[in-house]
Amino acid sequence: MKRRKTALMMLSVLMVLAIFLSACSGSKSSNSSAKKSAGKPQQGGDLVVGSIGEPTLFNSLYSTDDASTDIENMLYSFLTKTDEKLNVKLSLAESIKELDGGLAYDVKIKKGVKFHDGKELTADDVVFTYSVPLSKDYKGERGSTYEMLKSVEKKGDYEVLFKLKYKDGNFYNNALDSTAILPKHILGNVPIADLEENEFNRKKPIGSGPFKFKEWKQGQYIKLEANDDYFEGRPYLDTVTYKVIPDANAAVAQLQAGDINFFNVPATDYKTAEKFNNLKIVTDLALSYVYIGWNEKNELFKDKKVRQALTTALDRESIVSQVLDGDGEVAYIPESPLSWNYPKDIDVPKFEYNEKKAKQMLAEAGWKDTNGDGILDKDGKKFSFTLKTNQGNKVREDIAVVVQEQLKKIGIEVKTQIVEWSALVEQMNPPNWDFDAMVMGWSLSTFPDQYDIFHSSQIKKGLNYVWYKNAEADKLMKDAKSISDRKQYSKEYEQIYQKIAEDQPYTFLYYPNNHMAMPENLEGYKYHPKRDLYNIEKWWLAK
């Protein structure tokens, strides 16, 4: 998920992460160190991007899914952006100056930037955008991104002053990098309480990004066209068609037929896809992980010993080798090996596969088969639950079936339910939390902060869908926000990872690879572990 293609938020300008390359076989596949593009960029053409998930809306203050984020990154501009090496670069911002020991930032924005309707983007738009989540009437789920923000003030037509309540590295790497600047002249009179449902977000989005919104045929596609007035130069592509496809099988079939020509191919299909005509595949480690989330609102999962037993009962190595054909790495914590904050010198609790031990742990927690029906029970209640995942993600659907089979061996009844993406997002979001357990994934942010997902304050207003609560972890995560020294920050997070791994609010399954299929004649592409369509305005189709 994202999230955000969602979802976790990040800190320092100096961030440089080691990228682990995983080259795929075949003459037409490559890794992210592929040779540089040759030839002069050429204008024209339509790139057809395949997406299993359909966007929900086009406003970064409210969206929580990767599909929406993909479109937002093309429609809007941001004060900063993160490059392919995960370093922060200026974008709309001409300069950023830290003041008062990190408690304020003076931001000067570029002049002459225009929204798609021709109106100039000024400090008024920046102040308006950042004022929305500060309002008591704001109902979005991104509030934690701006918790540190005290105020945003206009200092001049092209200058803004951000004041913080406390030092927080998240502000520089997340609040500036992930907030799409909105047009005040269009939305300024809309009550904040009504802003999320405003038709602007779905029918008439106006940004200042490289592409302009043309149309959205729900269930079919979103069409974008090049912005001739984009402040960093007109895109080479004339149009981008973002095509919504029901599932991965259909997407791979459309990729082979040429109905789409850009798609993140599932691990189960990339070896087949690399044989398709007129395509090439770039493979590299994704900045993400896949997990099973246990809803602790459900009595079944309140006891951490039960959650530990569930993880112990699952053969994650087998899942990686059989479902993914070995194309992944077993995960134990909610952090990617790409991150400088990934703990390399500590041994976190892993709860490795041991069916006998899992049964013993459940028995100690009071779960036994008292009536001989093959299903564990406690106080007259069977250990039975529904495991949900999103429709169209073939790998997750397969994982759900494997989990069902493996847990059956220890006396747990699992019913699988495949749910359309936008419906699943609504079900798991506050105030619904309508799930027992779910197979999902987080697309990590470029700064390793677990606050938004695991802090208890984020249960009712953020991304802590599983109702995880640990007072010690809460304190550590909050304290870490004010730490700017990376070594000290990592030291603090060693304790956080230990506690999360011990509590198992998630069963961390694996770290995946990305396999980006694209036209063989696509030039200008650079692999980005976070954004599939990174710098799409600089891509072109050689003729």
Curated annotation (Swiss-Prot):
Location (main, coarse): membrane
Residues with a covalently attached lipid (N-palmitoyl cysteine): 24
Compartments (UniProt record): Cell membrane
Record InterPro entries: Peptide/Ni-bd (IPR030678), SBP_5 (IPR039424), SBP_5_CS (IPR023765), SBP_5_dom (IPR000914)
Keyword Transport: yes
Membrane protein topology class: Lipid-anchor
Signal peptide start-end: 1-23
Gene Ontology molecular-function annotations: peptide transmembrane transporter activity
This protein's UniProt keywords: Cell membrane, Competence, Lipoprotein, Membrane, Palmitate, Peptide transport, Protein transport, Signal, Sporulation, Transport
UniProt key word Hydrolase: no
GO biological process entries: establishment of competence for transformation; peptide transport; protein transport; sporulation resulting in formation of a cellular spore
Pfam annotation, one family: SBP_bac_5
Family affiliation: Belongs to the bacterial solute-binding protein 5 family.
Name of the protein in its database record: Oligopeptide-binding protein AppA
